[in-house]
Amino acid sequence: MKICIWCTKIFDLGGTKRVVTLLANELVKEHDVTIMVYEDRFKEDRNMYHMSEDIKVDFIDNDFFVNRHHTPAFCWRYLVRKLNNKWGIFNHEKLNSVLADAIFPQKTQDKWVEYLNEQDYDIIITTASLSLRLGMLAPRLKAKTIGWQHNCFDGYLKVPNVVFWKQEALLQEYLPKLDRYIVLSDYDKRDYKKILGIVTEVKINPRSFVSEKKCDPEAKRFLMATRFVYAKGLDLMMEAFEKFCREDDEWQLDIIGSGDLWNEIVADAKRRHIEDRVNFVGYTNEPEKYYLNSSVFLLPSRWEGWPMVIMEAFEFGLPVIAFHTGAMDLIIDDRKTGFLPEAFDVDKFAQAMLKLAHDDELRRKMSRNAIWKSEDFAIEKAVSEWNHLFEELMRRGEFYEQNKKAILQCRYKYQMRTTCAEYVKEYPVEEKTILYEAFGGRGMICNPYAIFKYLMSKEMYRDYKHIWIIDDYLDNGEEIEKYKKYPNVKFVKYKSKEYCKAISTAKYLINNVSFPSYFAKRKEQVYLNTWHGTPFKYMGFDIQGAGVAQGNTAENLLNADYIVSSGSYMTKTAYENSYKLKNIYEGVVLEEGFPRNDAFFRNNREETLGKLHRCGINLENDKKIILYAPTWRGEKYSTPETEMETIYELIRTVRENIDSTKYQLIIKLHQIVYYHMKEHQAETDSEYNIFVPATIDTNELLAITDVLISDYSSVFYDFLNTDRPVLFYHPDKDNFEHNRGLYFEEENLPGPVAADKETLGGFLQNISRAVEPYQERYRQIKSQSCLWDDGHACERIAAAVFEGTKPENPVFFNKTAKIKILAYAGNFENIDQADNFDEFLKSVDMERFDITLIGTGAENEKTAQKLEELSKKIRVLYWKPSYPATDEEYVCHDRFMKSESQDVPEMLEDFYSREFGRLTGKSQFDYVAIFTERKEFFPVMSKKIQVKRIFTGDNWREILKL
């Protein structure tokens, strides 16, 4: 692309010039880049910011565009500008034409339009005040137009006689004419929208370099790198440093830079008798040595946009002290990577300096945090986002106009799908970034939480970034607050736009259930599925009539690089048989035990009791804890039964039969049930305030439990690590087994089973006697399901996933001599194709072939029934049209499917490849068999599948000869 960056000057000191040069240096590697300037009073000096020789610099003769003769019109425009700057007289929508002409005369505009169109640029970017002028020209330019803000909203609109002072009405008319207006922070985005009604897009400035060398945290030197102008607050700095020097006689202050206020500030230092402590360096081409010889960076600015010097300071490991103005709190994490004293309070600024200067450990800690934080501002991320914007503008201009209605429908109907696809296609994978999700964002719990805590405790993983997916920020407030101080821990709202970005760009993905159907794993990503329990009740395709509902989970497991298993029983029951991964799963099953069970080998009793207390559950230390932890009931996981009377009846039974001087009861409902009854619980009597929130980890709770009462939940397997009693309460056994199914008969359980409350009450009256006959069975099941639980599961799994260490107990499912067939038979509405497929299944030798059917149309009752009736010897992957695709791909795919063409358009090849991967993971098939002649999604997509041959309904019998 041919890109022009238009600014007033470039070979001059200042953050804008620096970041423009930085971006241009990267863009010129892929594009033709010109920097156009017309007020640069300096000669060309590419060494100032190491400008690439490949960048063209176009020095504009401004006199060609502007008539500076003192004609009446010139004098009138001058008067209009002065009156408006003083009183805002012309800052009104009805007078926009007058003020616009005064700022940018029509004849001047005409010359600029002619000149810019002659250059044949694809994209024109303007900085600062020139964005308004570009907005005036935009409708007549051939190029796409982008305005680029380099200061905060207040710095542009609220500082007298600067940039857009008293020009709000002009901004409201002309900025929307730009194709994009870029701001530096979410605060600016909010203010432009709220105050001016202008839609903007955020792109932060990147760091300008990467340094292997870091500062010396022991150095007793402060550093400023700045321009000597009013906005930078050097007068405030002198006042604060004078106060600092009264309490300290060692630290020095180096100030790099120059400017109009140089003499004034130097004189101020002498007047305050601190000139021997301040080193006025002036301009330098070697700022690195000053960063390396300092340990704290100071920024007392009155206003800032997104200061480059902060990113530079972080890269060298310098914590930053800055006044809390603008977007500073989005860059500096207060008390983690620096301090943010109240704006312009020099006393608090001096106090922050003293605190960092006199606390060596705090300075070292903040230095490490600053280095971590620097990763957020990598130039690669910024360039990728800019390139994505360029491609979007160029690609979508014509395409959008031609397909506007269809695109808007896609964005409205498929917002999450299109957003995910955009991030997958356009954004790079972020190395050393780990995403954790448990039960759809319920909280920091289960196996993902155990792995997170392990990684956070190890020095070797200190430079990793951690992203936690959270559904309810209020419920998880305590944990969020706890980790706020860690700059490498971030929380993202479940099913938000940021969530789409996170699951699409994080290098490592850890989930204990499954990601949504619009998730498409990339080849560069590493997916660890930890699952969340050893099977007791039926799961996966073993559940009668639940095949369709299990489709997304099966797809997630097939996409996982690693799946965690508690042992051989779980591997065979859950993964090999229930989800039918045998023969086609290309990842590794890690039989290393559940990470969450490491909690049984740690003594965290007081910490867990503290969490319960803060939730309003006050347990007595001298009493044993009985925990009731039932599973969920109902036909659908998303809408479980929430009838509480059965729970309350159990509470009464327990309390009536236990010795209340020795025992106390708490209840941990299943994650999904708790969220559905949370509001109901709030209305119950306080005596029932024993329900443990879903945000508290179950295994932390089990570790302090003395007696477990379970039903059909798999938590009892984990609890066996404690060697403490477990009782089972099955008042609805026949109904539950009929609707769901169980892998274990009651007589094989490691504890007594009560079918009614009276029997349960009897067990509770003498627990020791009740469990005595089950001791041998208890030990047998424990040896089977807890074989690898030794307190080191997290360590083994982390070594395999993050270090590439060979797993200690790997299981592979892809070793088979069977011929693997991937079949498609449509929705079975066509009788001929349905008969063909039935005949195929009857004819094929299941001992020689492994058959996977892509099931579609399952939302149709008859089709769903047909799929359920198929032989259990074949594997059905249920495909639903919830695929992630860009709006362009949606529209092009729809157009292609309606056409008579059979040749897949090149622009859809990536989409079809992604969708096949989403459905089958890394599974490898030998042949494809398609039993329909209709032009449907899978037959079209199958043309891009790498197999030996594709058979059809006409020649499928040849498969039998293989």
What residues fall within each predicted segment?
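Membrane-proximal helix-turn-helix segments that form the acceptor-binding/catalytic region
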Residues: 110-117, 162-181, 498-500, 548-563, ...
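A short, well-ordered alpha-helix in the C-terminal region of glycosyltransferases
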Residues: 348, 355, 362-376, 384-388, ...
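Conserved catalytic-core segment of nucleotide-activated headgroup transferases in glycan assembly
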Residues: 230-257, 446-452, 595-679, 833-837
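Donor nucleotide-sugar binding/catalytic pocket of nucleotide-sugar-dependent glycosyltransferases
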Residues: 144-147, 154, 170-211, 584-598, ...
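Conserved donor-binding/catalytic core segment of Leloir-type glycosyltransferases
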Residues: 4, 182, 215-232, 238-241, ...
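Aromatic "clamp/platform" in nucleotide-sugar-dependent glycosyltransferases that forms part
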Residues: 283, 302
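Short hydrophobic beta-strand element within catalytic cores of glycosyltransferases
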Residues: 310, 319-322, 332, 708-709, ...
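Conserved acidic donor-binding segment of nucleotide-sugar-dependent glycosyltransferases
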Residues: 334-335, 339-346, 355-360, 752-756
